[in-house]
Regions:
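Catalytic cores of histone-lysine modification enzymes
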Residues: 111-142, 146-147, 152-158, 162-163, ...
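Short beta-strand element of the conserved SAM-dependent methyltransferase core
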Residues: 75, 195, 294-297
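Accessory low-complexity/Zn-finger-associated flanking regions
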Residues: 1-192, 340, 345-357
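C-terminal SET catalytic tail plus cysteine-rich post-SET Zn-binding segment of SAM-dependent SET-domain
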Residues: 1-28, 209-252, 261-264, 270-357
């Protein structure tokens, strides 16, 4: 790493080197994570601490992994084509996974008609015994990847857990095994700190999860009231299951705050045309309050290309629609205090946050 501190005056340079070394010492506890700054002599804040799992705060209740409900059938490699939990009708953990509607229609037209009626009417769906979409492909060469159906549709992804009889080799187990790629936190020219991967990534490849403090909604509101406008960049609501029976509401769901506690993904920048996406991944199908926020490559990403995702988590739009909204936003005098977006994408919305963008 080029040390710009060496070109600054003595006392300042010494202080900057001390801060740099202190941060690098923190990084030593994080496998496969590096720091690079070829822009200036700054270093990420020493107020930030790296962790390897969520840190629940007061008022947050989490499930005990020992109490997770596991699947009962063994995932046997000798079960024809290395099946097991891939035989999705029988895997209990995949009960609420996305239904494979095409297979269901072909295999059981009557049950398919009943399922469509339940789905379209909003009735409770009897998921047990229905064929499901398996989340991951397992190519002979290269890493496991998220199936294209899940990459595009954003359904929750379910994995087996420590109480399952299928064992650690089960093909549903990916995110829970942790990051397998090296990441570098680097200084960008105009957007603060960013992250790139030291390895080539293929579409659907798992990168890492987002970590931080898990807060109640009330505590989040209190912190936002005291913070500056950038606070929203680090807050992620666990609101995927709002509306489901027993799930939190918009006013009670927990929020992950990664500003001062987290991992390398905390430094990933926003883009209106991102190359990564964040997905819900759960090892406990009954827990709609706390689950993993997992980053996957949305497209093939060459090594040392900055990783980005959409902070607003919007679906892709046509470029002319984005341009029209951006022009209207630029003419709106109330947007003067809004944070501008510097992603540089052709579909850049111009500003971060806002339902009108």
């Amino acid at each position: 790493m080029h040390d710009h501190a060496a070109t600054t005056p003595g006392p300042i340079a010494a202080a900057e080197r001390w801060i740099r070394n202190a941060f690098l010492e923190k990084l030593q506890s994080v496998k496969g994570t590096y720091l690079e700054n070829q822009v200036d002599s700054t270093t990420p804040s020493l107020d930030f601490d790296f962790v390897q799992k969520f840190v629940p705060r007061e008022g947050v209740r989490t499930s005990d992994p020992e109490a997770y409900v596991g699947c009962s059938l063994p995932c046997r490699p000798d079960m024809g084509g290395s099946c097991g939990c891939e035989y999705t009708k029988k895997c209990d953990c995949l009960e609420y996974a996305a239904v494979d509607e095409h297979r269901l229609q072909q295999q059981d037209p009557a049950r398919y008609a009943k399922y469509i009626q339940e789905r379209d009417s909003g009735d409770i769906i009897e998921y047990a015994g229905l064929p499901k979409r398996f989340p991951y492909s397992n190519p002979k060469k290269g890493p496991k990847v998220l199936q294209s159906f899940y990459r595009e549709q954003r359904h929750p992804i379910y994995e087996c857990n420590l109480n399952c009889t299928c064992g650690p080799g089960c093909k549903t187990r990916l995110v829970q095994k942790g990051r397998k790629v090296n990441l570098t936190i680097f200084k960008t020219a105009n957007r603060g700190w960013g992250v790139y991967c030291n390895n080539d990534l293929v579409a659907g490849q798992f990168i890492d999860v987002y970590l931080g403090e898990v807060l109640t909604n009330d505590e989040t509101t209190r912190r936002e009231a005291k913070a500056d406008a950038d606070k929203g960049s680090y807050l992620y609501s666990l609101d995927k299951f709002i509306g489901d029976d027993g799930a939190p509401t918009a006013d009670t769901c927990y929020v992950v705050d990664g500003q001062y506690i987290g991992n390398a993904t905390r430094f990933i920048n926003h883009s209106c045309e991102p190359n990564c996406r964040q997905y819900t991944v759960s090892e406990n199908k009954y827990d709609t309050w706390v689950y993993n926020l997992a980053f996957f490559a949305y497209e093939d990403i060459p090594k040392e290309t900055e990783l980005t995702f959409d902070y607003m988590d919007k679906d892709e739009e046509e470029e002319e629609d984005v341009l029209r909204k951006r022009q209207l936003a630029a003419l709106d005098p109330t947007n003067g205090d809004r944070r501008p977006c510097n992603c540089g994408a052709s579909k850049c919305r111009g500003y971060l946050w806002g339902d009108d963008l």
